[in-house]
Amino acid sequence: MFGFGRLSAEGKVGIASGVVFFSMLISRTLISERVDKGTRALLFRVQFLLFINSLLLLGSLYLWKRVVKRLCGARAAPSVPQRCWRIIVLLFLALVHGSYLCMFFLVDTEPHWLSLLSFSCLGVYVILLFFLFVFGCLNRLGKLLSRSRSAEEAVASGSFRQTVLALIITAVLAVYGLVNAAQPPKVVDVEIPVEKLPESLNGLRLVLLSDIHLGPTVGRSKLQRIVSMVNELNPDVVVIVGDLTDSQVSRLRSAAEPLGQMKPRLGSYFATGNHDYYTADVEGWFELLHSMGIEALHNSHAKVFRPERTEDWICLAGIDDLEARMLRYPGHGMDVEKALNGCTTEGPIILLAHQPHAAKQALQQRPDISLVLSGHTHAGQLFPLTILAFLMNPFFCGLYRVSEHTMVYVTPGTGYYGIPMRIASRSEITNIVLKQA
């Protein structure tokens, strides 16, 4: 008979992760609609914390073997430097596992130092695990190819050097990533040709923001800097394409206040992202944004026009995030037809769709859409997550021509999620100028 106790530590953690994951699926399908919003949010957070820490534990066990056991050996009485190294690694892993606790319990107007430290450690953890895994695979390949004892010994000594090299590369990349993420977003000027654009709206300036992620590591001061940069561009329209926040209004009301200082001539608009739904407080954010003069496009659209030419307008539509329906968030779910109901095909249609997958689905339903603005990918945010983001999304970053009449622009995001690092990506404020095609 199968014995759970005979499994390795990694096997036990893997099974525990699977159990938690399936409990999340069951609760979403059978329980979520039978409990109130607050209880549902609490249940999701507890399950998410258990699941993410189970996955982190798998990586931590591997990391401990590589950077402690391999570097320090298996001596019964470790030396003082070896003891210090073990303590440092233990503290590091404790901070890594505590990072998502900070997301739920240490959110305020400005980031708490412990949140910044924990999520920085998480970034180091991700980078280090990647290089340890790659070097480990190379080492195993070397063992398979080696035929002599001397060759095997050379591979073993090379494994030690590879671990040290992984630590050095990680340190360099982490410092670069922290410095890069701390810089102001880069203003990127993009000129996009739009068919059927009226003459009166030729040259319309639209500023695109996305993935600000107000929360444990992004606070009021960073948002204030973003808003100041937006106002310097003197835009006609500002759009925020999802993932504005990672927590409830009650915790971030003060941090979000700078949003009310944006003064575009023709209005500010918002469409939801998946993280906005994770807060379980979308209606609260809709109300706060409305009080600041920002219109939430909840499967709806607005007419954008210049006051002197009201008959010439753009249909600016926004759809709920793809995950709203999966999360069974009451009254929410992506509905392209509802969002575009009332838009005329004689004029241009611009759609705000947070996820590139949503952009693809929307264009399959309505190929008459002129331009889709998306975010979500962060352009990977930091290597090696760049690889996953590229492989998992139909549009990764930048401007894409989908057809003769349709284009998609994916911003790498204006902020960052959790980990205050950007490697092989940048924070961006996109200054779009619409031109007649």
Curated annotation (Swiss-Prot):
Q: Which InterPro entries match?
A: Calcineurin-like_PHP_ApaH (IPR004843), Metallo-depent_PP-like (IPR029052), Metallophosphoesterase_sf (IPR051158)
Q: Where does a divalent metal cation 1 bind?
A: D211, H213, D243, H378
Which molecular function GO terms apply here?
A: hydrolase activity; metal ion binding
Keywords, sorted A to Z: Hydrolase, Membrane, Metal-binding, Transmembrane, Transmembrane helix
* Subcellular location as annotated: Membrane
Q: At the top level of its lineage, which domain of life is listed?
A: Eukaryota
Q: Where are the transmembrane segments?
A: 7-27, 41-61, 87-107, 116-136, 164-184
| The UniProt record lists the keyword Transmembrane helix | yes
Gene Ontology cellular component terms for the protein in this record: membrane
Tell me the SUPFAM superfamilies matching this sequence.
Metallo-dependent phosphatases
**Predominant location of this chain?**
membrane
- Cofactor annotation remark: Binds 2 divalent metal cations.
- Cofactor(s) it depends on: a divalent metal cation
Q: Where does a divalent metal cation 2 bind?
A: D243, N274, H376
Task: Report membrane topology.
Answer: Multi-pass membrane protein
What Enzyme Commission number(s) appear in the record? 3.1.-.-
- PANTHER family in the record: TRANSMEMBRANE PROTEIN WITH METALLOPHOSPHOESTERASE DOMAIN, TRANSMEMBRANE PROTEIN WITH METALLOPHOSPHOESTERASE DOMAIN-RELATED
| Family membership noted in the UniProt record | Belongs to the metallophosphoesterase superfamily. LOC643853 family.
Question: What's the protein name?
Answer: Transmembrane protein with metallophosphoesterase domain
Give the taxonomic lineage as stored in the record: Eukaryota, Metazoa, Chordata, Craniata, Vertebrata
Gene for this protein?
tmppe
